[in-house]
């Protein structure tokens, strides 16, 4: 039974990591400080600050280290400590970019992309008149990934599905719709029907696929040698729309530019949703193994925290 299902069978919602700084006022203050620096210096300062913050958060540091122990098998204690430091530093760099780029014209974002791989998969799907469900994870700069998809020349409209922020004002600030880009809150009652219609029009839907929802659609899948819960919903949606699922990740290279990787389409037939989920988790495992210090989960992924109140 998934760890977020109570013993009596009652489904409880996972409570993911959150903190009191996730408020618009703090974001505006951080953005004002970041805006005075050129990007290379801004990222460098953000890495230093985030590395220091990580060392002041022992509980979060322990969780990140435990997650990385499963990924970096055979790593020494010193190597694991360095990887934890790098994880916090990378999170700071991506946050600095989010502050400056979240309201930018999607077309302007192309200058930040150094390499793309797998665009041919998307082009073939769209050319055939299908929509596409792009499933990503909390790996790299996932917030920027949806915007980068929208700025592809000739791409159809992209609908980015995200969880609601605790601060509604912050959500309005971070997620600004554009003609080619629309943000959808997962909890909205009409969200699924709207996404289904968009896919049937040949548009793209981008969503997270690495955290369970706490609902009965979650399934346990082998992930780095142990079972973890993942949502089946993206594959149910794709099957209903007759659209494929494509793994998609936006990571940062050493030169500070982003690399966008889109995997081969996973077509989902009726009754094969679980097989599709397993294929997606295998792709996620490969991506995390390639970029372990760009994987941002500050809790035990194999036993996510729950709210039993």
PLM regions: where:
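Residue-level preference for nonpolar/small residues embedded in alpha-helices
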Residues: 26, 60, 117, 141, ...
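Membrane-anchoring hydrophobic helices of lipid-metabolizing enzymes
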Residues: 3-136, 171-174
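Short Gly/charged-rich anion-binding patches and loops
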Residues: 29, 63, 120, 144, ...
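Non-catalytic C-terminal accessory region of glycerolipid acyltransferases
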Residues: 18, 56, 81-85, 126, ...
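Catalytic core of membrane glycerolipid acyltransferases/transacylases, capturing the structured
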Residues: 128-187, 215-219
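Short, flexible loop segments at the rims of nucleotide/cofactor-binding pockets, characterized by
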Residues: 108-114, 181-187, 223-225
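Active-site metal-coordination segments of metallo-dependent hydrolases
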Residues: 62, 163-168, 227-229
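A short, structure-level motif marking secondary-structure boundaries and short turns
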Residues: 49-51, 106-107, 157-160, 218-220, ...
């Amino acid at each position: 039974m998934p760890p977020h299902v109570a013993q009596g069978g009652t489904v409880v919602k996972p409570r993911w990591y959150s903190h009191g700084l996730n408020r618009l006022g703090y974001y505006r203050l951080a953005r004002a400080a970041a805006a005075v620096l050129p990007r290379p210096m801004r990222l460098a300062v953000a890495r230093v600050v985030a590395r220091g913050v990580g060392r002041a958060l022992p509980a979060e540091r322990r969780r990140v280290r435990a997650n990385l122990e499963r990924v970096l098998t055979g790593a020494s204690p010193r190597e694991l400590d360095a990887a934890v430091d790098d994880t916090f530093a990378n999170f700071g760099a991506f946050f600095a970019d989010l502050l400056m780029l979240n309201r930018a014209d999607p077309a302007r974002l192309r200058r930040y992309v150094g390499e793309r791989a797998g665009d041919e998969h998307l082009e073939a799907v769209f050319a055939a008149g299908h929509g596409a469900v792009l499933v990503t994870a909390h790996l790299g700069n996932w917030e920027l990934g949806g915007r980068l998809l929208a700025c592809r020349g000739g791409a159809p409209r992209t609908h980015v599905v995200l969880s609601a922020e605790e601060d509604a004002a912050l959500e309005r600030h971070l997620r600004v719709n554009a003609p080619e880009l629309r943000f959808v809150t997962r909890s909205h009652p009409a969200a699924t029907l709207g996404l289904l219609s968009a896919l049937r029009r040949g548009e793209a839907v981008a969503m997270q696929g690495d955290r369970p929802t706490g609902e009965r659609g979650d399934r346990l899948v082998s992930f780095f040698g142990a079972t973890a819960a993942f949502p089946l919903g993206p594959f149910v949606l794709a099957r209903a729309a007759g659209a494929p699922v494509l793994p998609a990740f936006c990571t940062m290279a050493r030169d500070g530019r982003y690399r966008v990787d889109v995997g081969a389409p996973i077509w989902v037939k009726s009754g094969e949703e679980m097989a599709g989920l397993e294929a997606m988790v295998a792709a996620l495992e490969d991506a995390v193994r390639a970029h372990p210090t760009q994987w941002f989960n500050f809790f035990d992924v194999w036993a996510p925290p729950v709210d039993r109140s």
